[in-house]
Amino acid sequence: MSLGLIGRKVGMTRLFTDEGDSIPVTVIDVSDNRIAQIKTQATDGYDAIQLAHGTRRATRVTKAMAGHFAKAGVMAGNGLNEFQLDAAKIAEMTPGQVIPADTAFTAGQKVDVQGVSIGKGYAGTIKRYHFASGRASHGNSRSHNVPGSIGMAQDPGRVFPGKRMTGHLGDVTRTVQNLVIARIDAERNLIMVKGAIPGAPGGKVIVTPAVKTPLKKK
């Protein structure tokens, strides 16, 4: 149970260390994370906070959501996300409170970043699953990029579910684990994580403390 933040992927850049090493980083804008609701064990059966992020036109907000935001005294946001926390941490929070980047995370901390990968449309098995191409010649006639046999014999006489075939590639929720925060710009509420994260620039991402500890290399 840890506090996370909702952000927007800005893009990638690089940072230079004091030793001159170049580190590729992804910049995440986590500004305007505000508490829209506080849930407690007594009223909701569990302890959690509900965060709103970004802005949304009043004409694009339903009356139910508009009332929900107005009750907390916060500006309408682009969706809501919940984070379950300990009751002791929730007791220190109030509806409408804005959570800055340096409050939730620190430089050097490992985080998990969840986003929706870039959609690539209908793709073949070579692009989708890295299948090898067929022979370019020597008896190969119009079968250079086909996946090959997909079936069985008369028994069972069907294609098993889960068979790797052509289909839609991308546009799915993915989580990259154990990314290291290289730097936090507290003034502009920017988090810079080492490496790449899912999604296109401008896409919504959720940053949470890492839940798994990577195995040490022997």
From Swiss-Prot:
HAMAP family: Ribosomal_uL3_B. GO terms for biological process: translation. Part of the 50S ribosomal subunit. Forms a cluster with proteins L14 and L19. Keywords: Methylation, Ribonucleoprotein, Ribosomal protein, RNA-binding, rRNA-binding. The modification N5-methylglutamine is found at Q154. One of the primary rRNA binding proteins, it binds directly near the 3'-end of the 23S rRNA, where it nucleates assembly of the 50S subunit. NCBIfam families: L3_bact (TIGR03625). It comes from Polynucleobacter asymbioticus (strain DSM 18221 / CIP 109841 / QLW-P1DMWA-1) (Polynucleobacter necessarius subsp. asymbioticus). It holds the Pfam family Ribosomal_L3. Belongs to the universal ribosomal protein uL3 family. This is Large ribosomal subunit protein uL3. One of its GO terms (cellular component) is cytosolic large ribosomal subunit. One of its GO terms (molecular function) is rRNA binding. PROSITE patterns: RIBOSOMAL_L3. Methylated by PrmB. SUPFAM superfamilies: Translation proteins.
